[in-house]
Design a protein with these regions (language model features):
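Outer membrane beta-barrel transmembrane domains
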Residues: 57, 63-65, 199-297
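Residues that define the transmembrane beta-barrel architecture of outer-membrane proteins
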Residues: 40, 69-75, 88, 111-120, ...
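Outer-membrane pore/translocation modules
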Residues: 99-204, 248
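Outer-membrane beta-barrel biogenesis signature
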Residues: 23-45, 53-55
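Residue-level signature of outer-membrane beta-barrel architecture
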Residues: 48, 81-83, 126-128, 168, ...
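Transmembrane beta-strands of outer-membrane beta-barrel pores
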Residues: 48-54, 96-102, 128, 142-148, ...
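Surface-exposed strand-loop-strand hairpins of Gram-negative outer-membrane beta-barrel proteins
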Residues: 51-74, 109-113, 155
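Repeated loop/turn-to-beta-strand initiation elements of outer-membrane beta-barrel proteins
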Residues: 54-55, 87-90, 132-135, 177-180, ...
Length: 297
């Protein structure tokens, strides 16, 4: 019996697809995340994200669109404390995600659904420069493999591996209410030794790299509003299972639009729209929406 190349590639990808829908990319930033609050401030944030996808492109292959799709809903609770350490502003924080993956299919093949806790994220940005109008920060992120993971399933919320992301970025005021934020990061992956079953299938992944740029405008006449436009590019992240490439990577270009409003001096509501314009090695997000609510203390 012979199997076509396209069918073979779909089968291989479907067997290991759990990773493509998890946060395997580097860390996304909102438009003013690198502007710190004063030392002594606490912040609680809640994120609610919905995304829909209707095509998948394996690395170096053709787009698979017919019978392909995946929806997800993810909520994240985040706690941040800003403090002064030896003259530098530091913000230790923890992020706790909970997600659901559903309506998954690839080339007509149904994918498992999944729900549960995601991998907790620990981070502590350090602002090396924190001047009026200019900031520059070093931001490490540690992903702890404590999320929901069922070995061998095509979709999982947790990743069953350690990850470490190192990010550099800063903000520069441009005048007349305009601000730009630029950042770059590199993400290192540990191995998942249970990728295809308990104790079977060793998944390895190359480093992922990402650039993000934002331009924001806050009306001088009403500084409770901010509108922002952004772009992100990711590359690298090619995956192998037991030494064989599985058609997945983290190569993408994405555009973003964000609107935020302080409804009180300590409560901000923010909406974010994202859309992939190019993907090689994964699902293409047609629509990615996020509602963020932040409370400062």
């Amino acid at each position: 019996m012979t199997v076509s190349g396209t069918t073979s590639r779909i089968s291989l990808v479907a067997c290991t697809l759990w990773l493509a829908t998890n946060p395997a990319h580097a860390v996304d930033l909102n438009s003013q995340d690198l502007i710190p609050a004063p030392a002594g401030t606490d912040a609680i944030l809640a994120y609610f994200t919905y995304a829909t996808r209707d095509s998948f492109t394996p690395t170096g292959g053709d787009e698979i669109k017919q019978g392909t799709g995946l929806d997800s809903f993810v909520s994240i609770f985040r706690y941040v404390h800003y403090m002064d350490v030896a003259g530098f502003t530091v913000a230790p924080q923890v992020l706790m995600p909970y997600g659901r993956l559903y309506n998954g299919s690839l080339g007509g093949a149904r994918l498992d659904s999944a729900s549960g806790l995601g991998d907790p994220i620990l981070t502590a940005p350090v602002w090396l420069v924190n001047n009026p109008g200019t900031t520059f920060a070093l931001v490490p992120y540690l992903y702890v493999p404590a999320g929901s993971y069922d070995a061998g399933r095509t979709l999982n919320v947790g990743e069953n591996r350690w990850k470490f992301d190192l990010q550099l970025g800063g903000v520069q005021q441009l005048g007349n209410g305009f601000v730009t934020q630029l950042s770059a990061d590199a993400l290192w992956y540990g191995d998942n030794n249970d990728a295809t079953g308990i104790g079977t299938g060793r998944l390895k992944q190359d480093n992922t790299y990402q650039f993000q740029g934002w331009i924001s405008w806050t009306p001088p006449a009403d500084n409770t509003w901010t509108v922002s436009a952004g772009y992100a590019k990711s590359w690298g992240g090619k995956q192998q299972i037991d030494g064989v490439e599985n058609g997945q990577a983290t190569r993408s270009d994405q555009v973003r639009l964000e609107l935020s409003k302080f409804i009180t001096p300590t409560v901000q509501v923010q909406g974010l729209l994202q859309r992939d314009i190019n993907v090689d090695g994964g699902f293409k997000e047609d629509l990615h929406t996020t509602l963020r609510v932040m409370k400062l203390f």
